[in-house]
């Protein structure tokens, strides 16, 4: 029996990070977590490229451009969509989720969904580096693991 599993070694790998400016305070915290994870796992700073987009809805397009460029071993999407009084949250969170997944499947480059979809700002803050850890850090670790796992096939 052969078992495939991605390693958490990233020497020489290059990652693109896309961050939504909407809810920038949260996005910035997620970005810090992602950069920390990449550096801790051996990614050189010059192999990390960051693109800021207006909001989560714009992420799939830039993710597709990054993934199709073949410059990156993985792309990490970070941001926060926080529920408000209108159905806008449902539309945005659904479409960005589908868009990110579709880019990954189409390009065969790991495109990692690190976009928080929360009911409150407090929940987002908790997931951006306080009580619930930093989901940006987790997304970066996932990107490293998936980039290495894909090399096995």
UniProtKB/Swiss-Prot annotation:
Keywords: Riboflavin biosynthesis, Transferase. The active site is at residue 88. It is an enzyme of class 2 (transferase). GO terms for biological process: riboflavin biosynthetic process. One of its GO terms (cellular component) is cytosol. Pathway: Cofactor biosynthesis; riboflavin biosynthesis; riboflavin from 2-hydroxy-3-oxobutyl phosphate and 5-amino-6-(D-ribitylamino)uracil: step 1/2. Its EC number is 2.5.1.78. 5-amino-6-(D-ribitylamino)uracil binds at residues 22, 56-58, 80-82, 113. It catalyses: (2S)-2-hydroxy-3-oxobutyl phosphate + 5-amino-6-(D-ribitylamino)uracil = 6,7-dimethyl-8-(1-D-ribityl)lumazine + phosphate + 2 H2O + H(+). (2S)-2-hydroxy-3-oxobutyl phosphate binds at residues 85-86, 127. GO terms for molecular function: 6,7-dimethyl-8-ribityllumazine synthase activity. Catalyzes the formation of 6,7-dimethyl-8-ribityllumazine by condensation of 5-amino-6-(D-ribitylamino)uracil with 3,4-dihydroxy-2-butanone 4-phosphate. This is the penultimate step in the biosynthesis of riboflavin. HAMAP family: Lumazine_synth. Belongs to the DMRL synthase family. This is 6,7-dimethyl-8-ribityllumazine synthase. It comes from Alkaliphilus metalliredigens (strain QYMF). The gene is ribH.
């Amino acid at each position: 029996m052969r078992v495939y599993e991605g390693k958490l070694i990233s020497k020489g790998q290059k990652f693109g990070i896309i961050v939504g400016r909407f809810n920038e305070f949260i996005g910035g915290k997620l970005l810090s977590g992602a950069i920390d994870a990449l550096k801790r796992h051996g990614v050189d700073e010059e192999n990390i490229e960051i693109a800021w987009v207006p909001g989560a809805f714009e992420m799939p397009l830039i993710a597709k451009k990054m993934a199709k460029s073949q410059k990156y071993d993985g792309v990490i999407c970070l941001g926060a969509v926080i529920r408000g009084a209108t159905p806008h949250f449902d539309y945005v969170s659904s479409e960005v989720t589908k868009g990110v997944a579709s880019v990954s499947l189409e390009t065969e480059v790991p495109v990692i969904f690190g976009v928080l979809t929360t009911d409150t700002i407090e929940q987002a803050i908790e997931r951006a580096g306080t009580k619930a850890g930093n989901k940006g850090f987790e997304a970066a670790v996932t990107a490293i693991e998936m980039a290495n796992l894909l090399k096995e096939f």
